[in-house]
UniProtKB/Swiss-Prot annotation:
Name used for this protein in its record: Small ribosomal subunit protein eS1
Taxonomic source organism: Thermococcus sibiricus (strain DSM 12597 / MM 739)
Cited InterPro entries: Ribosomal_eS1, Ribosomal_eS1_arc, Ribosomal_eS1_CS
Family, similarity comment: Belongs to the eukaryotic ribosomal protein eS1 family.
PROSITE patterns: RIBOSOMAL_S3AE (PS01191)
Keywords: Ribonucleoprotein, Ribosomal protein
Entry GO MF terms: structural constituent of ribosome
Upper classification of the organism: Archaea, Methanobacteriati, Methanobacteriota, Thermococci, Thermococcales
Gene Ontology cellular component annotations, sorted alphabetically: ribonucleoprotein complex; ribosome
GO annotation terms (biological process): translation
């Protein structure tokens, strides 16, 4: 088998990159339509469907939000601009590890909910109690978590729900309610995944 000259291979790869255009990727309107990255492609259709990962810090400029990861999917391209939809978020593992220490209790809850405007979401809440707690207290905290998340979904639109979850407002409300059962270190909405959008 004839060997391909490494220089020719490198030149061919370089030519492929020359043929690609760079598209500017923007966050959805409810995140301010800010620029969140660049992505290369040789034709616009190949850009659609790509997932862009960024952080809430990069979107808002708030340096305290670097642990909040955001995921957006490109759904439309106009010229050199690529527009996205929110697909989910999660807290960085290192941040979660920093909260969970010895002799604390981590209480998780996973709930499928539908927002006021028909978006189906999988929402994962997390509460950290400052000490080891009894199983009955753990169940009570999880019930509070579920009640609050389901109530929020019924009352809020998709954009309102997502913003309250990622900016910490929903977690703060959860903490206020759950600490009536046992003293807490932290409460967070640690992950959201968009399962389905309402049918047009």
């Amino acid at each position: 088998m004839a060997k391909v000259n490494p220089r020719k291979r490198a030149a061919a790869a370089k030519d492929k990159w020359k043929l690609k255009d760079w598209y500017i990727v923007y966050a959805p309107e409810f995140f301010g339509n800010v620029e969140i990255g660049l992505t290369p492609a040789d034709e616009p259709e190949k850009v659609k469907g790509r997932i862009i990962e960024t952080t809430l810090r990069d979107v808002t400029g708030d340096f305290t939000k670097g642990h909040v990861k955001l995921y957006f999917r490109i759904h439309d391209v106009k010229g050199q601009n690529a527009y996205t939809k929110f697909k989910g978020h999660k807290l960085a593992r290192s941040y979660i590890r920093s909260l969970v220490r010895r002799r604390t209790t981590r209480i998780d809850g996973i709930f499928n909910v539908t927002t006021k405007d028909g978006y189906k979401l999988r929402v994962m809440g997390m509460v950290i109690a400052i000490r080891r707690i009894q199983s009955s207290q753990e169940r009570a905290v999880r019930e509070v978590m579920e009640d609050l998340i389901r109530k929020k979904a019924e009352e809020l639109t998709f954009t309102e729900f997502v913003l309250e979850a990622v900016n910490g407002k929903m977690g703060a409300e959860l903490a206020r309610e759950a600490k009536k059962i046992y003293p807490l270190k932290r409460a967070e909405i640690r992950k959201i995944k968009v399962l389905a959008e309402p049918e047009a």
